[in-house]
């Protein structure tokens, strides 16, 4: 109803599907991926990783019937200020960013806890072997063995990188 360009996913099959799934499983959140949702950030990912079951609804075309949103959806999430053909890619981004925070998903669980944005900063530069590649050397501090100084260097580099590339993260 209301006219306008594009098709809208019909309410009846969507409602049947959601109700059928909800009879089998209790969902902590029913999430709709939409450009007009709250922008996904690390805080949302952290919160969702603590939930048990999530049901993610992906729109297509012009979206879904508003009544689905009103009746079933508990959270609306956007991955950015742009439009995709459907919500499937956005849902994949959400699933990947949340799952990696669940204990046992990654081999090194501390890796996810030290990622960019976990402490509000971008990650510092990282290096691999060899120590010298075509005249480009790993910073000397990283080969010093002084763990306290290395950690301070990493913090300083993370802050500086954030200040240069994403100063908006420091304004909060």
Question: Where are the regions a protein language model picked out?
Answer:
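Short conserved micro-motifs on helix faces and helix-strand junctions that flank
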Residues: 1, 56, 78, 142-143, ...
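SAM-dependent methyltransferases
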Residues: 130-172
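Internal, active-site/partner-interface "lid" segment
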Residues: 89, 101-140
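S-adenosyl-L-methionine/SAH cofactor-binding core of RNA-modifying enzymes
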Residues: 9-60
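Structured adenosyl-cofactor binding patch, chiefly the S-adenosyl-L-methionine
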Residues: 64, 68-115
């Amino acid at each position: 109803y209301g006219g306008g360009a594009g098709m809208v996913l019909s309410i009846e099959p969507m409602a049947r599907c959601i109700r059928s799934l909800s009879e089998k499983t209790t969902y902590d959140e029913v999430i709709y991926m939409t450009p007009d949702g709250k922008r996904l950030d690390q805080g949302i990912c952290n919160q969702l990783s603590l939930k048990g079951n999530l049901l993610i609804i992906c729109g297509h075309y012009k979206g879904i019937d508003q009544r689905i949103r009103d009746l079933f959806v508990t959270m609306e999430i956007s991955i950015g200020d742009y439009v995709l053909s459907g919500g499937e890619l956005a849902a994949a981004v959400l699933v990947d960013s949340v799952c990696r925070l669940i204990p046992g998903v990654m081999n090194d669980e501390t890796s996810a806890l030290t990622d960019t944005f976990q402490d509000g900063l971008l990650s510092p530069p990282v290096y691999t072997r060899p120590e010298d590649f075509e005249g480009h050397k790993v910073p000397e501090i990283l080969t010093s063995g002084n763990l306290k100084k290395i950690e301070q260097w990493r913090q300083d580099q993370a802050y500086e990188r954030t200040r240069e590339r994403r100063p908006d993260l420091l304004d909060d």
